[in-house]
């Protein structure tokens, strides 16, 4: 395996499927467990790297890069959660043994991607050992409405003001301030696309049994603890909800990126 970059114990690889779907990876077929990490809206595989230093060397890490983002910025952008999940599932089936222990993890949009991928993997015969869903409810129903409100916590067509507020809340506004107008427009358009993708996804109830661990901030108004508890209905396996101090990006209270 050729590595051009090493950060947080993870190599940037240029080798078959790892280089395309998982550009930043700590992949080793001999490791007992691999953690597949999905980015939140506006983020890329690079955003997931700090997690690798937390889980330790014993666990393999595969950081997902969606088409049109990060190292795959020259590709046409993927538009649906289902399409991302299908690509990741195909890649994992090709590189993983069916006996491998694989855990899906993601925050907000990443949680939607993690659940959908885990569900598609189960159908493909590579059922995950567990799923960690952070900062996202399966749906939310507004008062007085008979229709599920498509989760995502943003307007149907988020404008630039909303997007800049989002960047400030995620601690990314300073980085975007240093960009030129063309680069800033690219960042905002990509973020808008990701938020709409998240909002448009409503998970299906499927006969899956993988363990599910949900985390959310006690002050999160997008994915409230009560709304996240509804994930209990989406697996016949073990379920646990953990609430932590903070809002939607509660993990920043703990020094995590």
Regions found by a protein language model. Give the residues of each.
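Domain-scale detector for complete catalytic domains at protein termini or as standalone homologs
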Residues: 2-105, 112-257
């Amino acid at each position: 395996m050729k590595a051009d970059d090493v950060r947080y114990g993870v190599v940037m690889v240029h080798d078959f499927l790892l280089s395309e779907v998982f550009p930043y990876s700590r992949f080793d077929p001999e490791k007992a467990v691999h953690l597949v990490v999905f980015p939140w809206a506006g983020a890329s595989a690079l955003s997931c790297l700090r997690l690798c230093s937390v889980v330790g060397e014993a666990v393999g890490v595969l950081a997902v890069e969606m088409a049109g983002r990060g190292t795959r910025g020259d590709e046409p952008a993927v538009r649906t959660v289902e399409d991302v999940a299908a690509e990741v599932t195909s890649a994992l089936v090709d590189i993983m043994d069916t006996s491998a222990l694989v855990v899906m993890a993601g925050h907000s949009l990443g949680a939607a991607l993690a659940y959908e991928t885990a569900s598609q993997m189960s159908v493909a015969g590579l059922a995950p050992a567990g799923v960690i869903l952070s900062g996202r409810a399966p749906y939310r129903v507004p008062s007085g409405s008979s229709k599920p409100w498509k989760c995502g916590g943003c307007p149907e067509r988020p404008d630039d003001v909303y997007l800049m507020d989002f960047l400030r809340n995620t601690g990314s506004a300073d980085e975007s301030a240093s960009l030129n107008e063309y680069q800033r427009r690219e960042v905002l358009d990509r973020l808008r696309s990701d938020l709409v993708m998240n909002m448009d996804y409503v998970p299906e109830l499927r006969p899956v049994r993988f363990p599910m661990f949900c985390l959310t901030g006690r002050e999160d108004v997008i994915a409230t603890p009560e709304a996240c508890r509804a994930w209990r209905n989406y697996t016949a396996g073990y379920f646990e909800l953990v609430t932590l101090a903070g809002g939607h990006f509660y993990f920043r209270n703990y020094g995590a990126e």
